[in-house]
């Protein structure tokens, strides 16, 4: 895949277009590829997803992307993570955010519940529960 969507290549940090941090999940016979776009130092570092019927593709980017972005979760540099299933049976995405609005590193960790709603085409429309972002505290 290439950076073809406007959200995947914003000019807020000088770098070549970047796509990285892939995770693949298989739900109900469909493969879901979660990926990050933009350089991690870019305030618009974000997470989107694509789907395919095979782990080898071809991958189709979902029009609902990005699902994690500073405009959705309220913190800059929100990207590069992984999906996991919690003890409650729900799916979550763990990812990085910038230290503050003016500092990138050291980055902080966030966890957000995923909301999966199957469409008429059999593909899940994935969003996040932005009201319940988990912010681990370190002493």
Show where each model-derived region lies.
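Carbohydrate-active catalytic/glycan-binding domains of CAZyme proteins
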Residues: 1-139
């Amino acid at each position: 895949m290439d950076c073809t969507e406007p959200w995947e290549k914003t000019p807020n940090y000088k770098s070549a277009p970047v796509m990285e941090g892939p995770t693949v999940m298989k739900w109900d016979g469909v493969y879901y590829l979660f990926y990050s776009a933009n350089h991690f130092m870019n305030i618009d570092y974000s997470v989107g997803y694509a789907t395919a019927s095979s782990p080898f593709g071809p991958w189709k980017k979902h029009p609902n992307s990005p699902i994690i972005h500073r405009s959705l979760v309220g913190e800059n540099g929100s990207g590069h993570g992984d999906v996991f299933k919690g003890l409650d049976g729900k799916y979550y995405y763990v990812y990085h955010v910038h230290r503050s609005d003016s500092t990138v590193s050291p980055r902080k960790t966030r966890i957000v519940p995923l909301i999966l709603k199957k469409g008429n085409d059999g593909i899940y429309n994935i969003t996040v529960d932005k009201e319940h972002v988990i912010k681990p505290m370190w002493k």
